[in-house]
């Protein structure tokens, strides 16, 4: 992550500022940061998007995976996150006031699943985004820690590649861990192939 702007912004200012077709940026507490994923990070995210897209078609679900969208936390106008993969409910989009103009999601019920692929800034995925997505009521959140970078309290000791599937139960996330050749199971999707992590 690289800080881009020296002044803080609101989400609306950030969306007005966001450069078309250049870079990938998030807003963290008013600070614009450029996300610079590695090739492997992008490959892993792409594998998950492909697998989920196949399942969506096979099951004929009214969902789609946008190329990019911004998730606005429920109680902040100074943050906006771009998940690595988002699965949105096509039928619920009419209820989202910011979608058509800014591809921004403010209501958790529009989202079926979010995936973050862990980078060196793993605390954002395990702490900040986890808490914000839970508050929004997003039913599923997957953390794909393909390098085993997260804290031991999350992925165990010794650290190793892990996929954490958080499911919202009575307003709180409950986690299941998957490793190596485990079949990833979730309430919405079962990825039948082996774990897409390299």
List PLM regions with ranges.
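Gly/Pro/Ser/Thr-rich low-complexity, intrinsically disordered segments predominantly at protein N-termini
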Residues: 1-198
